[in-house]
């Protein structure tokens, strides 16, 4: 193994070397575990360490390669997963103390796909309680690798921290209202939130069924896409998994963004983003234009109602997901999740239906916008990553700010690709996103990869 460890390789480059016998999966894994032992005490991103299981996986993979067998596209790649995905024989806590003894009997479809592709699963990662808003005992918040005093995101906090902190080569996360995008922004990761239905949710702990998306974190868009290409696709055990072919993401990475029509709503962004964020976005758009994209000014449909409607839709569906344990075990729930569940339980059918109708109207307006452009460029966070102290005093304005550029696209189900495009005066990451048409993740990947071929923000690493 290189002295630099797995962090020195791309996902596909590492897998090729393992498959060719130039590196062994066992050596790659031990190098990765050495980094975990060195860095994890400062980061606190892991709930369940899976190293012994991983060692058995790596040994089996090396034996197959020694016999001359063909192996999958993620051969030997160390990947960590958010602790909402079932792994047979291990607990799926979903960040909740009441689920510490909830032992999975089968594997999630995503886990099956990863292991069939040769990935080595190393850990189950930290998250907020019930995949929602706050970290609760016995599972503390992981620490931002750039600054322990700053927020690490929610709910896929462990996935963002582990990826940027060097605990894995790539990670699996999920998003319901911003839970991939916000940790990517807080920690400076590249990530993909695919279209709703692109990835099976079988064996995944549910927050809100029609809002939940499983996605990927990595150090580059190309790496995140390589992992997404493995976990995506139809699944007979999840009838909501779309019956659509998975794009050729390797071809997309090579294609570039020549001819892409990129929309930007300058007024909407200016109303919700500070100067540093807006300036960094302008620079990113200029790079994409230099790479061949055409930039067009657009008007995004009003998202004001969507931010708050998201909470109502999420609340009702979360109440359904927790009906076996709430309110029966109310004392085991934290205040944020309790508040959401109570909202869901008291909402009338007419109120909920009104939210669904507005949701469909918004989705239709976005779809109409995407007949004029291929993608939208926008921030993820419109303000600097907040401190942990500030997060203890969140108000409605801050909540709206967090969700302005995220949860409307969870209501609509449109895909997004997220990547770093700067750093602020405190040295913390600035991140932007490209949002596109349903099931056209490959267009976004092509543009994101083109941007990262021209810039090096995604290559910058915190000193640990």
What are these regions (language model features)?
Residues 1-56, 66, 290-292, 351, ...:
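An N-terminal boundary/leader segment
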Residues 74-214, 267, 378-397:
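Short glycine/serine-rich loop/turn segments
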Residues 13-20, 98-102, 212-219, 342-347, ...:
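Short, well-ordered beta-strand elements within core beta-sheets of diverse protein domains
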Residues 74-94, 254-266, 313-367, 415-429:
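Short helix-loop capping/hinge segments that flank enzyme active sites or metal/cofactor-binding pockets
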Residues 13-19, 268, 303, 322-411, ...:
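Serine-dependent amide/ester hydrolase catalytic core
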